[in-house]
Amino acid sequence: MRIGILDEHPEWSRRLIAELEGRGLEVERIDHSEHGFDPRDRRPHWDVVVNRTSPSSHRRGHGRVLFYAEPLLAHLEALGVPVINSVTTWRFEKSKALQVGLFERLGVRYPRTVVVNGVGPLRRAARDVRFPALVKPNVGGSGALIERFETPAELQARAAELDFGPDGVALLQEYIEPRDGAIVRVEVLDGRMLYAIRIVRRSDQFNLCPADLCRVPASDALAACPVDAAPVLDITRHEPPQEAVEQAIALTRAASIDVGGVEYLVGAADGRTYVYDVNATSNFVADAPRVLGFDPFPAFADTIVRAAGRAARVAA
């Protein structure tokens, strides 16, 4: 069995690869920051490919990955290679606008949001959103480029200075103050909740990504890994209400996410639950045995092996 791990980050798949290799499996990390494929080559080179492409790749000088991943994944799927977190998954992963559209279609409560692609539309959208509000790039990644504005006047004054990210699309979103400063991430694997964690910020730094538990300092982008979350986060295992679990499973299913997380918060003002992010790049929580009481990587590896096994039986 030959397993491909599609990941441009040099560290994020290290634990997964170690788990798979520990089982005697052949694993290749596919660095698609410098890569190519021939559409005429119809040979499947892997029994299964795990797509771990992250929207934050552009923060590490790998912006081409954002656009290259889609045709590469489509090519692999056309060859019949099972892909965990498929090309459909990637489309949702890299677009917060698509995620918001999914929330709306499924009837999931989320912060009021308007999608824009220019300064003029952003300024006009300020009339339709309550403040404080956030401006988020459509292509996110580790909380980068998110700006908070207390008033419409403040936004109007700074709108022309904002960086909308690699595709020039941004979201203007009502800021919901989370109760106790906490958010919850529900991690889903193969259609079931694997675990949930409660994350509380201990820093005023806003460009923080509780999704993959990392920050991306401008001076050292490769430091963006879960291990570095400790100075700014309190992370504990959490048992979310069943409704939140079912909602997370429904969202991941609708986005074709085989492994990923759904993040929500409870509003401090109204006590209502708001979903605000779906993330398909699962690095899992740092020091999982201590925080969770178990290591999630064996379960992830089991899912990968099962996917390859199903494909082999179909081919036979």
Set out the residue ranges of the language-model regions.
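Conserved N-proximal alpha/beta basic substrate-recognition cap immediately N-terminal to
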Residues: 8-112
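Short glycine-rich anion-binding loops that position phosphate/pyrophosphate groups of nucleotides
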Residues: 54-57, 138-140, 281
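Rossmann-like NAD(P)H-binding beta-loop-alpha module
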Residues: 105-131
